[in-house]
Amino acid sequence: MQYEDENGVNEPSRRRLLKGIGALALAGSCPVAHAQKTQSAPGTLSPDARNEKQPFYGEHQAGILTPQQAAMMLVAFDVLASDKADLERLFRLLTQRFAFLTQGGAAPETPNPRLPPLDSGILGGYIAPDNLTITLSVGHSLFDERFGLAPQMPKKLQKMTRFPNDSLDAALCHGDVLLQICANTQDTVIHALRDIIKHTPDLLSVRWKREGFISDHAARSKGKETPINLLGFKDGTANPDSQNDKLMQKVVWVTADQQEPAWTIGGSYQAVRLIQFRVEFWDRTPLKEQQTIFGRDKQTGAPLGMLHEHDVPDYASDPEGKVIALDSHIRLANPRTAESESSLMLRRGYSYSLGVTNSGQLDMGLLFVCYQHDLEKGFLTVQKRLNGEALEEYVKPIGGGYFFALSGVKDANDYLGSALLRV
């Protein structure tokens, strides 16, 4: 693996090479391919779930407050567009594809069998919506000199740098744009990705990809049941209520009073971390120690010393950490103080399983994704509190990046990123 230096890596030569490959692919001379390990598949939901549909048009993009679907994919791309007009063409094209794929319809028929088929065919003759959401975010690198967008960069957007416990692989970090693709079933997610790549060979090149899942019963609960991660603990118990609009305005969405560029209003900062678990080591760790590390009962999810998952721990009555250790994950992540209220964020994580590492260990972990109105007050502040926690012995962040999720598409005459590109 190629590892990141502390401040990340710059790859202009790679982008130029990929642009040339993309042009060949558009001409039908060279397919764009990126080798990846075989991904794990979540189970299937009921047939009725295929007809579930999320609205595409609105103030915010779907896939952020949407209750988690069972299947998910993160795909980062390098943008091959040559200028701002080309970038607008890309965003308009993505908007068109997202609108069709998320709402469903008949698969296009290929008029000439001597030409490549217009659709991959993996969903059959009808493309069901299947609760599909595709969320577009932009990375720090999109605001370099290529498109003249530097003055419009979100104020808190930055390149992800290494924390003390990180072991970042450069091939799994950053990206000009990121797609978070979620649906009830994995074949719908894969179909969406292939459709997008087919329509953008001269504009996008895959940088890295990871697929994730949560259990079907957690997905069917529509946010009422907390998913369990591959360490066996509930993941996201302390999430703020995504159905509380007033709270989401405070926690997730960029608002006019933040002195951000005007185009960012209605969008959200997105932090992505690919975290590898040392599951064999974890499975040989005593239950009591596991629970002490997290600060929760493994079966119920309740804070130690309490009965129910959503009971609020009373740290003031446990100042020495005799019940919930001072360095436990939940106590460090959210100390429940007046100051920590400003670091709330909405988590939307998924498990992943990739096979085995080069050393023969199971390659499993967490695709950590969170949204917040301020990256520094949210994820970065929380992660700094977590530096040195006991859990670090069992987890290793290996990739990801920081992005900005664009605001929504108003109507059929609008397109993703229009407010940014019209400045």
From Swiss-Prot:
Q: Which cysteines are joined by disulfide bonds?
A: none
The positions making up the signal sequence are 1-35
Residue positions binding heme b: G236, T237, A238, H329, N334, P335, R336, R347
**Location(s) in or outside the cell:** Periplasm
The UniProt keywords, alphabetically, are: Heme, Iron, Lyase, Metal-binding, Oxidoreductase, Periplasm, Peroxidase, Signal
- Top-level taxon of the source organism: Bacteria
Could you say which cofactors this protein requires?
heme b
Membrane-crossing residues?
none
Gene Ontology terms: biological process:
iron import into cell
Cited InterPro entries:
Dimeric_a/b-barrel, Dyp_perox_C, Dyp_perox_N, Dyp_peroxidase, EfeB/EfeN, TAT_signal
The UniProt note on the cofactor reads as follows: Binds 1 heme b (iron(II)-protoporphyrin IX) group non-covalently per subunit.
Q: What is its EC number?
A: 4.98.1.1, 1.11.1.-
- Reactions accelerated catalytically: heme b + 2 H(+) = protoporphyrin IX + Fe(2+)
Annotated GO molecular function terms are: ferrochelatase activity; heme binding; metal ion binding; peroxidase activity
Q: According to its UniProt record, how is this protein modified after translation?
A: Predicted to be exported by the Tat system. The position of the signal peptide cleavage has not been experimentally proven.
Q: Name one Pfam family in it.
A: Dyp_perox_N
Q: Which GO terms describe its cellular component?
A: cytosol; periplasmic space
Family to which this protein belongs: Belongs to the DyP-type peroxidase family. EfeB subfamily.
NCBIfam families annotated for this entry?
A: Dyp_perox_fam, tat_substr_1
Quaternary organization = Homodimer. Part of a ferrous iron transporter composed of EfeU, EfeO and EfeB.
State its role. Answer: Involved in the recovery of exogenous heme iron. Extracts iron from heme while preserving the protoporphyrin ring intact.
Q: What is this protein called?
A: Deferrochelatase
Q: What species does this protein belong to?
A: Escherichia coli O1:K1 / APEC
